[in-house]
UniProtKB/Swiss-Prot annotation:
The gene is murE. Keywords: ATP-binding, Cell cycle, Cell division, Cell shape, Cell wall biogenesis/degradation, Cytoplasm, Ligase, Nucleotide-binding, Peptidoglycan synthesis. Pfam families: Mur_ligase_C, Mur_ligase_M. It catalyses: UDP-N-acetyl-alpha-D-muramoyl-L-alanyl-D-glutamate + L-lysine + ATP = UDP-N-acetyl-alpha-D-muramoyl-L-alanyl-gamma-D-glutamyl-L-lysine + ADP + phosphate + H(+). Its EC number is 6.3.2.7. GO terms for biological process: cell division; cell wall organization; peptidoglycan biosynthetic process; regulation of cell shape. One of its GO terms (cellular component) is cytoplasm. It comes from Streptococcus mutans serotype c (strain ATCC 700610 / UA159). A motif (L-lysine recognition motif) lies at residues 406-409. UDP-N-acetyl-alpha-D-muramoyl-L-alanyl-D-glutamate binds at residues 44, 162-163, 189, 197. Belongs to the MurCDEF family. MurE subfamily. This is UDP-N-acetylmuramoyl-L-alanyl-D-glutamate--L-lysine ligase. It is found in: Cytoplasm. The modification N6-carboxylysine is found at residue 231.
Amino acid sequence: MITIETVLTILKNNANFREIIDGKHYQYKYSNPEVAFHHISYDSRDIKASTLFFVKGATFKKEFLEKAIESGLTFYVAEKDYQVGIPLILVNNIKNAMCLIAKEFYDNPQDKLKTLAFTGTKGKTTAAYFAYHILKQGYRPAMISTMNTTLDGKTFFKSKLTTPESLDLFKMMAQAVANGMTHLIMEVSSQAYLVGRVYGLTFDVGVFLNISPDHIGPIEHPTFEDYFYHKRLLLKHSRYVIVNSQMNHFALIKEQVADQPHDFYGKYSDNQIINSKAFSFDLTGKLAGHYDIQLTGSFNQENAVAAALACLQLGASQTDIQKGIVQTTVPGRMEVLIQKNGAKVFVDYAHNGDSLEKLLSVVEEHQKGTLILILGAPGNKGESRRADFGYVINAHPELQVILTADDPNNEDPQLISQEIAHHIKRPVNIIVDRKQAIQKAMSLTQSENDAVIIAGKGADAFQIIKGKRTAYAGDIEVARKYL
């Protein structure tokens, strides 16, 4: 519950209050300070008694508000007056207002949890899983992740966004507190800062894994600089930071965090991976010692080290860290099936040029025969990935390629595939139906030296088509049918 008086105080203290508009009357203080709200929402279909409703988004329509009023809405917050006959709290920035009011409404749950946030172009989910398995050795961590979210350590569900909307985020935090959880691990996207989902939130530990061009397009970031800047905001809003010293533009980040408590990891730091093998590595520095690991690839070892250093700051012992790392597996990350002829099928979430390059390098290290890649690109987002995929594929000339659908949304998957193919300097196959593409690729293998690489969707059991999630069995399940 939150009173209107408290709402107004929060907004005024944040210089985010213009006035209340009630009909033709403008008010600085509301005439009835006893008004209270028992529910907050930004979804016009989610209206209960005493709801404070937030109008957000460029596509919001007046009729949504009118429907909410039919359901009993009596008050709303917005950046403009929709003139719908109920009182309005007019603000300058709706997203900032949502964050600050949600924090108070849910009794500041972030102060009752130790918070750990990961950002980076790739590896956020894997690093979050490492942290989850490390912290659960001695604590009760909750996790909000692209792949899975758990608020009680028992039940898991799929997240719609990498970083939830602020009203959902603070509600989740409050549920975690109510469930007796001690820590919260989450992924923070550049979009979360761009659109203000985590405004006013300071994390106990923030980790910056890496940076490469991604999420650049008309509805995301206009330039790489803008993308990089919004990624770096996590460092500004974290009490302790962990940074990969091998990442691009590290010199700038090193200067930025010089006056903050921090750790660096990687070749150019005290915390270096040595004696790296397929399923183990040694570490120098604060956590010097031997570590076994199930997830193959140097990038997974780097993610493990990042999570280890972060969890050390949050109370984990080195023994907890060693146990947690070896226990970690991630759905849709380097999952492997074996065909009857011995060929391997790799299913991985690699969905940009950088992660695809690392995936191909790991597979090529172990499989020396025919390699067939199945790949697509999402519609209406990250258009720059399409050219990036072409550049990566050109660097692997022996690779056979089948282009297919991967969340085409409102675009034609055939045209998306043709755009990717335009950047590839050799003939490729296009099979838009993803199931048929997987079946075809698996029919081309002959021996244990061969491999099929299914990239992009990981464990996602859906296809996004025309703005909606459409049922799809998932790459692993489809591949199992053709073993």
